Every structure is written in structure tokens, then in C-alpha cells.
């Protein structure tokens, strides 16, 4: 994303873009790296950056010999809204998932397990049976995780990788 595009992206995010997802790719090695790039390099106002709900970080993971690399999602962080100038110093980022290199898996953090996600609670507040019931919400997250894992296993077993594409995932949800 370039400066003019970044400003347009954040304007769409701030106004809600008719309640649709507004997403962009911004290169940064961490949530703070994304913030720094958006605010300092692309000149998006700090108040506009607060329209960001989450930052997903993908990075290559290398083999010990350095000859092989695999791209992995290594961090999923929520952006809180209560900070004023520096989201890192003011605890404006909350990690919900972190990559475990030993297991080659993305794992939930204690914050996610304990229900410290304003985004997920906001979504849950509009679902009967989930509003105010973090255990039900988290159980559903775990169930969906098992379903996605099974889809991957079936896709590998049958070599039908269309099962992993958005069209099928939309239907399977």
C-alpha cells in the first residue's frame, strides 16, 4: 500500500465501508512495525490507525541449515482503541495467537483463552447463546479449528485442494 492508497484504505475503514471487511497488505515484521509504517512512512493519522482491528503477521521460517524456508502466519494481534500516542508503550496491541516454532503451529495466547478479545466479544454480543458467555464462544472457536483441521486432512488425502478455497469454506461454515 502506498501513501495515497493507505489514506483511502483507512478512510474506508473509519466509515465502515457499508459494514464490509476492509483489508490491506502492509509490510511489517510486527504489529508495531505495521503501525510505524502506516503512521510514519505512509502518513496516516494515529487516530485513523485505530480503525485497524487486527494485525496478522506472516514471515518465513527457516530450516536450521538455512537452505529451506516456509512462510508461516506467526502472530495475530488485536488493536485496542484506548491508547493515544504509542500503542506499544500503552498496551494497544494484544496478541491472540503466536507461532510455536517447535510444534510448527499457531497457538492461542492466555489472553485469547481467557476471553480478552474485544473484537470477538463484539461479534459474540450479536449471537444468541454467545453474548456474555465466553465459554460458549471459545468452545465454538475450538470446534471450528477442528473442522478446518479435518478439511486440511481430507484435502491432503484426496488431493482435492479446492476444499481449502474460499468458495467451499463459505459453504462449509
Located regions from the model:
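Terminal-proximal interaction/regulatory segments of ATP-powered molecular machines
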Residues: 128-173
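Conserved P-loop NTPase nucleotide-binding/switch module
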Residues: 1-60
Amino acid at each position: 500500500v502506498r501513501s495515497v492508497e493507505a489514506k483511502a484504505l483507512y478512510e474506508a475503514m473509519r466509515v465502515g465501508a457499508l459494514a464490509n471487511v476492509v483489508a490491506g497488505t502492509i509490510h511489517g515484521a510486527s504489529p508495531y512495525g505495521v503501525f510505524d509504517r502506516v503512521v510514519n512512512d505512509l502518513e496516516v493519522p494515529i487516530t485513523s490507525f485505530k480503525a485497524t482491528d487486527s494485525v496478522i503477521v506472516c514471515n518465513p521460517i527457516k530450516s536450521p541449515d538455512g537452505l529451506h524456508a516456509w512462510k508461516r502466519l506467526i502472530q495475530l494481534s488485536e488493536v485496542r482503541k484506548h491508547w493515544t500516542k504509542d500503542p506499544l508503550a500503552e498496551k494497544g496491541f494484544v496478541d491472540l495467537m503466536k507461532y510455536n516454532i517447535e510444534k510448527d503451529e499457531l497457538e492461542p495466547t492466555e489472553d485469547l483463552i481467557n476471553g480478552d478479545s474485544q473484537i470477538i466479544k463484539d461479534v459474540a454480543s450479536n449471537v444468541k447463546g454467545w453474548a456474555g458467555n465466553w465459554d460458549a464462544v471459545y468452545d465454538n472457536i475450538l470446534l471450528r479449528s477442528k473442522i478446518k483441521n479435518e478439511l486440511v486432512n481430507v484435502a491432503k488425502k484426496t488431493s482435492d485442494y479446492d476444499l481449502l478455497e474460499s468458495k467451499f469454506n463459505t459453504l462449509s461454515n
